[in-house]
Amino acid sequence: GIPCAESCVYIPCLTSIGCSCKSKVCYRN
């Protein structure tokens, strides 16, 4: 997937723009 501009180690991903956590990095679905 396309990496989002954030990590999901300490904060959750921006699911409102379709990002989900994979391997400690937020990816767009």
Swiss-Prot record:
Instruction: Supply the Pfam families for this chain.
Output: Cyclotide
Covalent S-S links between cysteines = C4-C19, C8-C21, C13-C26
PTM notes: This is a cyclic peptide. Contains 3 disulfide bonds.
Q: What's this chain's function? A: Probably participates in a plant defense mechanism.
**What InterPro entries does UniProt report for this protein, alphabetically?**
Cyclotide, Cyclotide_bracelet_CS, Cyclotide_sf
What is the organism field in this record? Answer: Melicytus ramiflorus
Its UniProt domain note says: The presence of a 'disulfide through disulfide knot' structurally defines this protein as a knottin.
Question: In terms of domain of life, where is this protein from?
Answer: Eukaryota
Family membership noted in the UniProt record:
Belongs to the cyclotide family. Bracelet subfamily.
Query: What are the entry keywords?
Result: Disulfide bond, Knottin, Plant defense
Name of protein: Cyclotide mra1
Q: Name one GO biological process term.
A: defense response
